[in-house]
Structures are given as C-alpha cells and as structure tokens.
C-alpha cells in the first residue's frame, strides 16, 4: 500500500494555485478558543492523527449507519446518504495518504528544524505537490458537505419528523464542524509551516 501511494504522489501532475496564494479559511467554531497557532508542529500532527483521523473513521461509520436506518423510512435522504458514504470513503483514503506518506516526512522536517540539521528532499523533490493534493481533497469535501447542508435544509428535519431524523442531522452537522477544524489546522498551520521548514532544512544540490 505505501509503495503504491508513494508512486502515485510522485507521478501525479497538478496545476493548483500555490498554497500561500489561497484564500485563508476562518477559524472554525469547535476550535475558536484553542490556540492551535501556538502549538508546535509535532503536537499538531499528533492531534490530527489521534483526534481527527480516529474520530473521522469512528464517527463517520456510526453516522452512516444511523443515516441508513433513517433513510430506510425517509427516502428524501437518499442523496444525503450517498454523499456521506462517498465522503467517509474518500476521507479514509485521504487520511491513509497523510499517515503513510506525508506526515512521516513532515515529522522528519520538524525534528531536523529542532536539531538545526538538514535532511534529504522528499522522494519527489518537494512536499508541495502532495500538499496541493491534500488541499484539493479538502476542497472536494467542503463542497460535498455544503451540498449535504443544502439538501437537509441546513440540518433541519421536516416538521413532525421522528426524533431519530433530527438526531442524525445533528450528527452530520457536528461531523462537518470538526472536519472543518481538521482542514483548517492543516491548510492554515501545518502545511505552511512544513513548507517553510522545507525551504531551510532540506539539502539541495
């Protein structure tokens, strides 16, 4: 699996806007009182892995099963269920790419910077291409969950609907909110810092 991901990241051709030219995201609600900007890079990566990646997989599966149950009685949720199924499948693939390829190298960059050392370049020369891939995935998920929000009338169940209907919509909103925190931390803090360290702590010949 890891060899396949390395080959994919090394050969993919991208033409996205550079990371620093993108429109910045506003800090999401779940994290508005947490000073992530002051955290060290290794702590941020650890938080993403142990909180966001774990919970994306755990609660994504839980919510999908709840959706299947409610959708079996309320077929207007068919499209929502399809979108969410595709989301958790794509997010699992996305997280795996980060865990197996990108984040280990970012941690190496952090350790090199802490020890004032230099390390060899990423296997495809720079981490900019895989970072742009990850950010493109983020954009896709934000668009997908915006569509879910629209399809559910801003996560509002029809009048008189069973409690389980509103409960699953509340869970969908919570999932989106924490996904936005996950994306914000990576887009606005982790990736820019990693690129800055790469500029100063990677051997160039």
Residue ranges of model-derived segments:
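Small-residue-biased structural context
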Residues: 1-205
């Amino acid at each position: 699996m890891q060899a396949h991901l390395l080959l994919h990241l090394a050969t993919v051709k991208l033409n996205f806007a550079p990371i620093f030219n993108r429109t910045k995201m506003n800090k999401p609600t779940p994290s508005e009182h947490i000073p992530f900007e002051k955290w060290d890079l290794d702590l941020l990566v650890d938080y993403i892995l142990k909180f966001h990646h774990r919970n994306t997989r755990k609660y994504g599966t839980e919510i999908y099963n709840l959706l299947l149950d409610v959708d079996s009685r309320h077929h207007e949720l068919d499209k929502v269920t399809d979108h969410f199924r595709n989301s958790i499948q794509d997010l699992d693939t996305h997280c795996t790419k980060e865990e197996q390829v990108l984040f280990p190298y970012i941690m190496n960059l952090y350790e090199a910077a802490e020890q004032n050392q230099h390390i060899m370049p990423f296997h495809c020369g720079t981490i900019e291409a895989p970072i742009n891939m990850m950010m493109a995935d983020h954009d896709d998920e934000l668009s997908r969950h915006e569509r879910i929000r629209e399809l559910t009338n801003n996560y509002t169940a029809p009048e008189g609907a069973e409690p389980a209907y509103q409960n699953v919509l509340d869970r969908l909103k919570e999932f989106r909110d924490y996904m936005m925190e996950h994306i914000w931390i990576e887009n606005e803090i982790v990736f820019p810092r990693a690129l800055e360290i790469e500029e100063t702590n990677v051997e160039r010949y």
